[in-house]
Amino acid sequence: MQTDAKNLTALYLITLNVQRLPKPSPDDLASGEEAAKGLISNLDNFFAADKKPATTNDADWEKAKKDTELLAHTSLGWIALQKKDNDTAEKEVTKVLQSNPNNAQVSYWLGTAIVAEKKPERYSEALWQFARAGSLDQAQGGLNPQAREQIDTYFIHTYNRYHGQDPQGLAQLREQAKAQPFPPAGFKIENVEELKAKNEEEFRKKNPALAMWMNLKQELTGPNGEQYFNNNMKGAEVPGGAEGIQYFKGKLISARPAVRPKELVLAITDPNTPEVTLNLDAPLPGKAEPGTEIEFAGVPTAFIKDAFNITFDVEKKKIAGWPGKEAVPVRRHAAVRKKG
């Protein structure tokens, strides 16, 4: 339909009401867009000083002009969302929030537009907008309780899926977003993959030997475990100084025989699950209690995938932490004869 570009009332009503249509047609959207753009392009003319009613003061006239401009940009943003023109939607609703920060509905639209652009590096910004939309009170431009609850539920679900369960972080984001309409420069929420990588790196730095062992175990229990063992471990000393690691560390499960053993079974990943069997080239002195921490390096010779276990040939000198001592031989003194 053709819109009278000089009729403020007609343009205003079309711009206002297009957002209220439950299922706007392409023609409805086109008319709304034309009307909103007509308002913006004729704004100075519509609100010229010589057109101000005598009963309206200057401040109210200027406010009416600003409100009309905001309505036009709000409508253009909404129309762009319906058309899946997400870049335009983002630009228009950002203009609205820059002029009127307290508008939960528009904050939600901004978050929706950012997500729809499918740029994962910007999802933190979208979460900020969802948090704000679900946190603003009605007196601050928030939505009615039912709509607010729906958006907040969506925010929680989206946050947890992106970042993982973090009640403290979620509550903090709510407070930050409620206080200001846009996140600060450099704002970032780490996603689950980034957090996983970060935690793995921290773990590796604090427990390099255990981290290496867990990586080996992951390879060995994977679909190509046997091939990995034969090509990368069997017959070679492990860990062998790789990444600066000289020894693995485990806890004693059992020793055979109990005294002066030549075979040790150790747990590494957790203290109760046997994972390695050490065959020694010479018996160790004395004995050790289960749970004793043992360090070792050796040559893998066999591997069981299902009930995970690696057998190592180990030189006695490459065992550290063994507390047993050789028994001190009893010295027998000859009997002293008495003089008769």
Label every PLM stretch briefly.
Residues F130-P183:
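Long, ordered, amphipathic alpha-helical scaffolds
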Residues P167-G340:
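OB-fold and OB-like single-stranded nucleic-acid-recognition modules
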Residues Q19, A30-D44, K118-G142, I156:
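TPR/TPR-like (Sel1-like) alpha-helical repeat modules
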Residues M1, L39, K95-V96, A133:
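Canonical positions in the second alpha-helix
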Residues L81-A113:
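A contiguous binding-surface segment within folded domains or other stable secondary-structure elements
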Residues K118, A126-F130, A147, A267-N272:
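Mature extracellular/secreted ectodomains of secretory-pathway proteins
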Residues T3-P24, G38-P53, K63-I79, Q105-A113, ...:
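Amphipathic alpha-helical repeat scaffolds of TPR domains
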Residues L21-P26, K83, E117-P120:
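Structural motif corresponding to the intra-repeat A-B loop/turn of tetratricopeptide repeats
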